[in-house]
Structures are given as structure tokens and as C-alpha cells.
Amino acid sequence: MKVKPSVKQICDKCKVIRRNGRVMVICENPRHKQRQG
């Protein structure tokens, strides 16, 4: 999980979602998991 000030989609399978007021990227590639914070 990368924590970044700005999250971006890295590949076509990445999805930007909101969870508990946090913006997150989920992907089938675990290296692409990101959270804004």
C-alpha cells in the first residue's frame, strides 16, 4: 500500500474508489494499491 498525496491510476485495471472518506486505488496487481493521506 502506497500512501500518496495524489493517487493516480497506473494501469487499465486500477479503480479509484472512496472508502470512509479516503480516496483509494484498488487493482489486481498488489503493487498498484494506493491510498490518499
Curated annotation (Swiss-Prot):
TM region positions: none
GO molecular function: structural constituent of ribosome
GO biological process: translation
Keyword presence, Ribonucleoprotein: yes
Keywords annotated in UniProt: Ribonucleoprotein, Ribosomal protein
Pfam families referenced in this protein's UniProt entry, alphabetically: Ribosomal_L36
Family to which this protein belongs: Belongs to the bacterial ribosomal protein bL36 family.
Name of the protein this chain belongs to: Large ribosomal subunit protein bL36B
Statement: the UniProt record of this protein carries the keyword Ribosomal protein: yes
Cellular component aspect of the GO annotation: cytoplasm; ribonucleoprotein complex; ribosome
